[in-house]
Amino acid sequence: GFPIPDPYCWDISFRTFYTIVDDEHKTLFNGILLLSQADNADHLNELRRCTGKHFLNEQQLMQASQYAGYAEHKKAHDDFIHKLDTWDGDVTYAKNWLVNHIKTIDFKYRGKI
């Protein structure tokens, strides 16, 4: 996988070149950082809310452009939502997932949605 930034925050190496997506990714990085600092219900619920909103927006962009990788991408989103819904406190998993999802799965749609 890709290295996990320390401190855990978005940087230009994660840029998709879609402003809305990049801004939402920054929010997800921050949400996971907050959860790593204090694993509590408020932080988890906020991360769930931001993640759900972002995934919906991203999936709508993919559908609107008839992106060929939509089904695979949506499954990755669904799997992460399930992980949040059954949260076990594994912040390292969440950090790794976001970094690797952006750099492997999201980067596939650059210039295509």
Swiss-Prot record:
Transmembrane segments: none annotated. Belongs to the hemerythrin family. Fe cation 2 binds at residues 58, 73, 77, 101, 106. PROSITE patterns: HEMERYTHRINS. Fe cation 1 binds at residues 25, 54, 58, 106. Homooctamer. InterPro entries: Haemerythrin (IPR002063), Haemerythrin_Fe_BS (IPR016131), Hemerythrin (IPR050669), Hemerythrin-like (IPR012312), Hemerythrin-like_sf (IPR035938), Hemerythrin_metal-bd (IPR012827). This is Hemerythrin. SUPFAM superfamilies: Hemerythrin-like (SSF47188). Keywords: Iron, Metal-binding, Oxygen transport, Transport. It holds the Pfam family Hemerythrin.
